[in-house]
Amino acid sequence: MGILDKVSSPADLKGLDADQLEQLAAEIREFLIQKVSATGGHLGPNLGVVELTIAMHRVFDSPSDPLIFDTGHQSYVHKILTGRRDLFDTLRQKDGLSGYPDRAESPHDWTESSHASASLSYADGLAKAFELTGQVHRHVVALVGDGALTGGMTWEALNNIAAAKNRSLVVVVNDNGRSYSPTIGGLAENLAALRLQPMYDRVMDTGKNALGRMGWVGDRAFQVIHGLKEGVKHTVIPHEMFPELGLKYIGPVDGHDLKQVENALRYAKDYGGPVIVHTVTQKGKGFDPAEQDEADQMHSTGVIDPITGESMAKKTEGAISWTKVFSNHLIDIANDREDIVAITAAMAGPTGLADFAKVHPSRTYDVGIAEQHAVTSAAGLALGGLHPVVAVYSTFLNRAFDQLLMDVALLKLGVTLVLDRAGITGSDGASHNGMWDLSITGIVPGIHVAAPRDARTLELALDRAVAVDDAPTVVRFPKGDAPAGIPAVREEDDYDVLFEQSGDKSEGRVLIVSFGALSKQALGAAQALCDANFSATVVDPHWVVPTADSLLEFARGFDLIVTIEDNGVHGGAGSRLHYDLSQAGIDVPVRNLGVPQEFLAHGSRGEVLEDLGLDAETVARTVVGYAEKL
């Protein structure tokens, strides 16, 4: 029996000696490699925080002392140590273990969101609450890093944390130089410089001792050298970052040396005020394929071989992902248009811009985990005569809504937002679903929003989007492979007709308006209507927003209109169409199918859609049921 088999709670860590702790760390890494290889998940980040997490649980008393994990994907080791080891075979699967902290799973989990840079604000609020309620014996610890320090919210929180000199709060910086890919920007350079600081300090300590033996001459010499040293130091470390914020700074500490980390954390715990513990770690540590993966050190994987790290996913011959279709076509557009530039928020690989950057490196900008800055920076590029394309996950656009509204739309600027992972993403859970973008973008004045149904219409949508130079445009698509071509039986100026057929008895004319990726469900429902003797037509609008006048007029002659979307049904595309029909005086009953107004549990995309009644069979049955009530 290994050490890990004996650990079911943080209390089991307290009595382990140094050798046992080292063995435990090795066993946890092997456990992670075996389990995450079989299920997929965030392997690289968790291999890098094994010792950090063990030390945090040994020094602090969770759950009495909240441990907050920024971005959440660094929490696997925390889950292992808090009694959830036996659930890892179900990681990110329906009704299984969440890939992020989950308050329903354990009292040790204080937060749930997978969005970066929020942990310090949570921690600040918790520390204030403990102070106000007389629970000053409780400590709050936030593990931040893996790129989250590039987010502005982190620095807003640090500014507030530093103002309370006697409030106990420990910020552990996991400095692995990465988010998905290598962390960029001045902050990353400063953290790298801070790693050098002990070298300067050791050299100066040695010099001071040697010169001190020379009496007053030596003292004067040291003062001169010290002045030179400070000048050099401040060149390498321009603002000393954390100390100049008024925060006690400890480090850098080897994040894989348990003794060093524990000593630093114990000092921070007893300090009596806010403390930064700067640790240096290696993402993917202990798994050679991850360590050698220059792109992202296996930040997130599917099912892989636990020895070689090679993907074990079955590939459909000829299949191409939505992301790849976008990437390839944006390169083609940029080859013809020198004004096209691309922006990513620390996710060049996942959003398809890594390939674009290889072809057009000078026209690609990675701003770090800073979606708000990305959108307003894009506005500046547009003001300068360029057409920026900002590629982000749909869920992360939520953070930049004000910038889209006030910095882009108000100025009538031509900026294109490409929203990957729109709709239901599945295994990453509630905070990764892109089920709000049609609702929030749809209220922006002047905006154009497209939801293509397949690879060809994605290319056409992107062409239309970058042709607009006086308003923001949005192109959204889901996770996964783009379906094989879904042809139109007739193409109109503003919409495509995908299906047009009368039932034998034509008991009623039903129009199905399909917004984007659920077109196959719409077509299945149309065939079911015909089988039930109804007349059915399916249309796919070129623009979800604004609603084309020609589509409204086309809809006038039907007995029932049904809309289908993978967005929140409240305030979504269907409800917008319903409103526009009403305003046009078109009095046709409308039924909207979409995602309910609730946070969704994780599972595969197909499983979640089925639970929501948005699978092909249920959609067909529901639509026929609507028609039968005419």
From Swiss-Prot:
Coiled coil: none annotated. One of its GO terms (cellular component) is cytosol. GO terms for biological process: 1-deoxy-D-xylulose 5-phosphate biosynthetic process; isopentenyl diphosphate biosynthetic process, methylerythritol 4-phosphate pathway; terpenoid biosynthetic process; thiamine biosynthetic process. The keyword Membrane does not apply. Binds 1 Mg(2+) ion per subunit. Binds 1 thiamine pyrophosphate per subunit. One of its GO terms (molecular function) is 1-deoxy-D-xylulose-5-phosphate synthase activity. Keywords: Isoprene biosynthesis, Magnesium, Metal-binding, Thiamine biosynthesis, Thiamine pyrophosphate, Transferase. Pathway: Metabolic intermediate biosynthesis; 1-deoxy-D-xylulose 5-phosphate biosynthesis; 1-deoxy-D-xylulose 5-phosphate from D-glyceraldehyde 3-phosphate and pyruvate: step 1/1. Mg(2+) binds at residues 146, 176. InterPro entries: Dxylulose-5-P_synthase, THDP-binding, Transketo_C/PFOR_II, Transketolase-like_Pyr-bd, Transketolase_BS, Transketolase_C, Transketolase_CS. Pfam families: DXP_synthase_N, Transket_pyr, Transketolase_C. It catalyses: D-glyceraldehyde 3-phosphate + pyruvate + H(+) = 1-deoxy-D-xylulose 5-phosphate + CO2. Thiamine diphosphate binds at residues 73, 114-116, 147-148, 176, 287, 371. Belongs to the transketolase family. DXPS subfamily. Catalyzes the acyloin condensation reaction between C atoms 2 and 3 of pyruvate and glyceraldehyde 3-phosphate to yield 1-deoxy-D-xylulose-5-phosphate (DXP). Homodimer. This is 1-deoxy-D-xylulose-5-phosphate synthase. The lineage of its organism: Bacteria, Bacillati, Actinomycetota, Actinomycetes, Mycobacteriales. The gene is dxs.
